[in-house]
């Protein structure tokens, strides 16, 4: 029994001793040594105060409960970035792989003989929006349509005459005979070639 009471007394003394040391350590931590520590502890106690030392904007901020949150400029097939500060950007500048008007089709071939600087650029960059205005696009499309009407289809091949000249360099009557020449790999027969010359 004596050993039991001595173990109990020594454990109580041990706990009492560490209780006093622990309280003094807490008391030392609670009293700040300088004003810098006081500011640090206040920031720790108030989690809503943030360090605004960095000048960059936050990506997501709450403005008000009735105002809209910031709009992000992304999308599926987004091809350009508007650098102007306009809220909406250009009209209809979104979509799945948005491209030029009427620049689609099965087996569509883009010959850039007249426009060598375009280099098959199907997407409209934003670096010069005046160049890509509706008037310029309409002029380009009218010129493109006026040259070879109905020149599309699966397996469409450019027609060259026996003289080696392209289709557009002949007289207008010769072009009218070839106007509706399209289809699945359609070619002229020898009889048709002789009658057209």
Swiss-Prot record:
Keywords: Amidation, Cleavage on pair of basic residues, Neuropeptide, Secreted, Signal. One of its GO terms (cellular component) is extracellular region. Residues 28-56, 80-86, 188-197 form a propeptide. It is found in: Secreted. Transmembrane segments: none annotated. Its main location: secreted. The modification Leucine amide is found at residues 96, 106, 154, 184. Residues 161-197 are annotated as: Disordered. Residues 1-27 form the signal peptide. One of its GO terms (biological process) is neuropeptide signaling pathway. Neuropeptides. Belongs to the allatostatin family. This is Allatostatins. It comes from Apis mellifera. The lineage of its organism: Eukaryota, Metazoa, Ecdysozoa, Arthropoda, Hexapoda.
């Amino acid at each position: 029994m004596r050993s039991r009471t001595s173990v109990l007394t020594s454990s109580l003394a041990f706990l009492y001793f560490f209780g006093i040391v622990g309280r003094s350590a807490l008391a030392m931590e609670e009293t700040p040594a300088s004003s810098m520590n006081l500011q640090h502890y206040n920031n720790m106690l108030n989690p809503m105060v943030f360090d605004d030392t960095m000048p960059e904007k936050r990506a997501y901020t709450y403005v008000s409960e009735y105002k809209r949150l910031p709009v992000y400029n992304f999308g599926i097939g987004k091809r350009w970035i508007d650098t102007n500060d306009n809220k909406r950007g250009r009209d209809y500048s979104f979509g799945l792989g948005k491209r030029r008007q009427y620049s689609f089709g099965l087996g569509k071939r883009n010959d850039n003989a007249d426009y060598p600087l375009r280099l098959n650029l199907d997407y409209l960059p934003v670096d010069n929006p005046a160049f890509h205005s509706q008037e310029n696009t309409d002029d380009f499309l009218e010129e493109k349509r006026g040259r070879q009407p109905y020149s599309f289809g699966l397996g469409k091949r450019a027609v060259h005459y026996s003289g080696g000249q392209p289709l557009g360099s002949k007289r207008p009557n010769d072009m009218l005979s070839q106007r509706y020449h399209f289809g699945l790999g359609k070619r002229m027969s020898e009889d048709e070639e002789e009658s057209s010359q």
